[in-house]
Curated annotation (Swiss-Prot):
This is Isoleucine--tRNA ligase. A motif ('KMSKS' region) lies at residues 605-609. The gene is ileS. Disulfide bonds: none annotated. A motif ('HIGH' region) lies at residues 58-68. It comes from Shewanella baltica (strain OS223). Keywords: Aminoacyl-tRNA synthetase, ATP-binding, Cytoplasm, Ligase, Metal-binding, Nucleotide-binding, Protein biosynthesis, Zinc. Monomer.
Length: 940
């Protein structure tokens, strides 16, 4: 036989080297949809223990961004890995569909409700718009390879969900947590509505900072409290504020009871003034007022001034000095201007003293008609007029521009105000909600663990939750209130159930269309319908009940995991915790996982103006979804997640390493039929048994990392295995055996069996992350199998077998180290042009006694491990001067070019080549593999 090429077992596979993911992935998605893949997975897990990850609903407005992709991919990895662990893990995606952003978009198209269009028509337009947005986002999420019940998602605007949201509110009411009150809330004058905590963003703003004097109603009596008798000059308390527009609503001056205050006298512009300031702030205040010299007349504790009266600087009444724990000396004067209608601390201390909650400002941010001096002016524009009036009244001590962090509307990006309005609140303390919520936080696992202290602080400090909004597109607060007493109807809970039943059939419009007499009969005249809508955070925050408890696929199991961005501690995690604790006395989740925000390669937020936005659609169209998925998995999500084109290209490089490994495995399984060719692990060649043992240990580590949601550990271990144990060692060594051994012989079938077992395991390891690639591999694996890898469980065929005669794992690790040293010396010889490839080399290993014993244990098979034609082991003491030192003190190496003839078939240089008459160009081993029973390998 002259052409021995046909006697080789050359690798062959349909699995292409290039993934061409951008084009192939959509084809796979089409097949997944056609085959009903998600339902196949559900059917495969009937009766199994449920694992419920509840999807926090993104807002149905605009295209998805990279943050959405991170969130959905992380959820998908968890769902798929839990399914692989045998759980019944349904995934029902959801969308948040009510609220202001949708209203604003619809207003741009059809105008405001009640003007060109009726409120009912407006709601219908909002519903249509939200549905369009859901469809667009759904396609983008599906393109990412996220499996779920995409044809039956939950929408907060589904009639059934709207009805269940009303039912959730009724349970909160039944538990006694709802109350109505006039309280200051975050108010956006552009929205004309209250804002939730989560709808407030803080940005820098320049405000007028002013110091204002409030003259004592009885200066002589006030001076006496400082030990000054018969004082004849006016005495004033001084406040510092950055909101001059709130001064018309001032109703008190707050002091700290234990703080020392000084009475300071000075002369300015020929007038003697006496001011009360916190002792520690006297110097900084007088510097602001350009006072060069002063006299401290006396000192007194804040408690001494409780209920002492001071004249309002421009309105015709006086206000009391009161005591509050919120007063600090961080800035200002140590005396706080107190307007209960315009601040939370002011409101709380005002309640204690029974102060009027004055609110001279309308919904649009304009002073009401009866506001003296400023009627009809917008509050922010009125600031200058307030300052001018104070100056005119000689009450202004200082006025400067002050740059500070100030609350802004998340939607309009404009400054908001605190404004007292009649609203509906969930009380944090009336029935112990705060205390119980804090207990529930302790019972929940927070990942990362700093999430616990973060949400604890928020719950400890948060005010009552204002759940009412003055909007058109939202779930109505379906209450009837007595026109005279403002009390709720005594049968509110049962009435709400009747309303919910109507909403279930007709949607929220049923409430607006409802004639009160239909439910209340003769009582209808005594009651009015509430026209407020619910905060959208109530919509999404109640989905553990309105969706999870209502849908059959969740089996009434309750939620195991919430997973969202770290901004949701004060958003969805908070609202869900409050509602669930109010309804059921417990948290709605067992675990809460948060991921960081995406930033660019320089750590900056994504911004169109900077031009650093990475759109997921662009990535999938260019690189493929699996590259994006690999980046998500490989990034530690506990902090900020850095992404750029360069970083994604690095992910593509890492992907190629995994893909090339998969291709090698598949190509070398060509012709392998597991049913008849599989060699039992205990019967394998030692090296094959070792690599299966390594894969079995790795599988346990990978499963554990998946269970702990440490996906970056999964990718690290996978890359290490592909690059080192497989790529640099095992796969390199077995090429010779795989290609040249007898096709049906034990030596080849042993290593094919190892490759098969590793392939079966690895396709499952990568499936939660590289879903498209895993499917591609799965379709080409030999043997009988189900249609999809996603219905499988972790592979059980990886047996960790160690025979009594086996070489230890440490042995193979040592051999890998020796091989690396040999490779370095061979590479140098190649660079020096002393040899061509490694099979032209004969290597002599000078080793100490211990290493010699290890190296000689596998006899002639050492050359197969080192990929050389010859490998001799001699005592370290015999090392010649030409021998090269290595990083191992126990080893020196000498490489020489072989003088033996090269075997035409295996390319090894062997002395016997040319001595076999029938095959003069072959070595003995190749002849045995062609004509005989095949070579015997014990070790490698």
């Amino acid at each position: 036989m002259s052409d021995y090429k046909f006697t080789l077992n050359l690798p062959e596979t349909e699995f292409p080297m290039r993934g061409n993911l951008a084009n192939r992935e959509p084809e796979m998605l089409e097949r997944w949809t056609k085959d009903g893949l998600y339902q196949q997975i559900r059917d495969s897990r009937i009766g199994r223990t449920p694992f419920i990850l509840h999807d926090g609903p993104p807002y149905a407005n605009g295209s998805i961004h990279i943050g959405h992709s991170v969130n959905k991919i992380l959820k998908d990895i968890i769902i798929k890995s839990k399914t692989m662990s045998g759980f019944d893990a349904p995934y029902v995606p959801g969308w948040d569909c009510h609220g202001l952003p949708i209203e604003l978009k619809v207003e741009q198209k059809v105008g405001k409700p009640g003007q060109k269009i009726s409120a009912a028509e407006f709601r219908e337009e909002c519903r249509k718009y939200a549905a369009e947005q859901v469809n667009g986002q759904r396609e983008d999420f599906i393109r990412l390879g996220v499996l779920g019940d995409w044809q039956n998602p939950y929408l907060t605007m589904d009639f059934s969900t709207e009805a269940n949201i009303v039912r959730s509110l009724s349970k909160v009411i039944e538990s006694g947590h709802l109350h109505k009150g006039v309280k200051p809330v975050h108010w956006c004058t552009d929205c004309g509505s209250a804002l939730a905590e989560a709808e407030v963003e803080y940005e820098d703003k320049t405000s007028p900072a002013i110091d204002v004097a409030f003259v004592a109603a009885d200066s002589k009596a006030v001076a006496a409290k400082f030990g000054v008798s018969d004082y004849s000059h006016p005495v004033s308390m001084v406040i510092w504020t950055t909101t001059p527009w709130t001064l018309p609503a001032n109703r008190a001056l707050s002091l700290s009871p234990e703080l020392d205050y000084s009475l300071v006298e000075f002369e300015k512009d020929g007038v003697t003034q006496a001011l009360i300031l916190a002792e520690v702030l006297v110097e900084s205040c007088l510097t602001r007022y350009n006072v060069e010299s002063h006299t401290v007349l006396g000192s007194a504790k804040g408690a001494a001034f409780e209920l002492v009266r001071f004249n309002h600087p421009f309105l015709d009444f006086d206000v009391p000095a009161i005591l509050g724990d919120h007063v600090t000396t961080d800035a200002g004067t140590g005396i706080v201007h107190t307007a209960p209608g315009h601040g939370q601390d002011d409101f709380v201390v005002g309640q204690k003293y029974g102060l009027e909650v004055a609110n001279p400002v309308g919904d649009n941010g304009v002073y009401k008609p009866d506001t003296e001096y400023f009627a009809g002016q917008h509050v922010f524009k009125a600031n200058d007029n307030v300052v001018a009036l104070l100056r005119e009244k000689s009450a202004l001590l200082n006025h400067v521009a002050y740059r500070h962090s100030y609350p802004h509307c998340w939607r309009h990006k404009t400054p908001i105000i605190f404004r007292a309005t009649p609203q509906w609140f969930i009380s944090m303390d009336n029935h112990g909600l705060r205390t119980q919520a804090l207990k529930e936080i302790e019972q929940t696992q927070w990942i990362p663990d700093w999430g616990q202290s973060r949400i604890e602080k928020m719950v400890e400090n948060r005010p009552d939750w204002c759940i009412s909004r003055q909007r058109t597109w939202g779930v109505p607060i379906t209450l009837f209130v007595n026109r005279e007493t403002e009390e709720l109807h005594p049968d509110s809970v049962s009435l709400m159930e009747r309303v919910a039943s109507r909403i279930e059939q007709q949607g929220i419009q049923a409430w607006w269309d409802l004639d009160a007499a239909e439910l209340l009969g003769d009582e209808a005249e005594q009651y009015r319908k509430v026209t407020d809508t619910l905060d959208v955070w109530f919509d999404s925050g109640s989905t553990f009940s309105s969706v999870v408890a209502a849908r059959p696929e969740f089996h009434g199991h309750g939620v195991d995991l919430y997973l969202e961005g770290s901004d949701q501690h004060r958003g969805w995690f908070m609202s869900s915790l409050m509602i669930s604790t109010a309804m059921n006395g417990k948290a709605p989740y067992k675990q809460v996982l948060t991921h960081g925000f995406t930033v660019d390669g320089k750590g900056r937020k994504m911004s169109k103006s900077i031009g650093n936005v990475i759109a997921p659609q662009t990535v999938t169209n260019k690189l493929g979804a699996d590259i994006l998925r690999l980046w998500v998995a490989a990034t530690d999500y506990s902090g900020e997640m850095t992404v750029s084109d360069e970083i994604l290209n690095r992910s593509a490089d890492a992907y190629r390493r995994i893909r090339n490994t998969a291709r090698f495995l598949l190509a070398n399984l060509n012709g392998f039929e597991p049913a008849k060719d599989l060699v039992a692990v205990e019967d394998m060649v030692a090296l094959d048994r070792w690599v299966v043992r390594r894969a079995a240990a790795l599988q346990q580590e990978i499963i554990e990392a998946y269970e702990q949601y440490n996906f970056h550990i999964v990718t690290q271990k996978l890359m290490q295995f592909c690059s080192v144990e497989l790529g640099s060692f095992y796969l390199d060594i077995i090429k010779d055996r795989q290609y040249t051994a007898k096709q049906e012989g034990h030596a080849r079938r042993s290593c094919q069996s190892a490759l098969y077992l590793i392939s079966e395991a690895m396709v499952r390891w990568i499936a939660p992350i590289l879903s498209f690639t895993a499917d591609e591999v799965w379709q080409l694996l030999p043997g009988e199998r189900d249609a999809y890898v996603f219905t499988q469980e972790w592979y059980q065929g990886l047996k960790s077998v160690t025979l009594a005669t086996d070489l230890s794992d440490d042995y193979w690790q040592q051999l890998l180290t020796v091989r690396n040293e040999v490779n370095k010396v061979i590479e140098q010889a190649r660079r020096d042009k002393r040899i061509g490839g490694s099979l032209e080399a004969e290597v002599t290993l000078f080793a100490d006694a211990a290493l010699t014993e290890q190296l000689t244990h596998i006899g002639d098979e050492l050359r197969f491990v080192l990929l050389t034609s010859e490998a001799k082991v001699l005592p370290l003491a015999d090392a010649t001067s030409e021998a090269v030192e290595t990083e191992l003190a126990s080893l020196k190496l000498l490489v020489a070019s072989s003088t033996a003839e090269k075997c035409e078939r295996c390319w090894h240089h062997r002395e016997e080549v040319g001595t076999i008459e029938a095959h003069p160009t072959l070595c003995t081993r190749c002849v045995t593999n062609i004509e005989g029973d095949g070579e015997v390998r014990l070790f490698a």
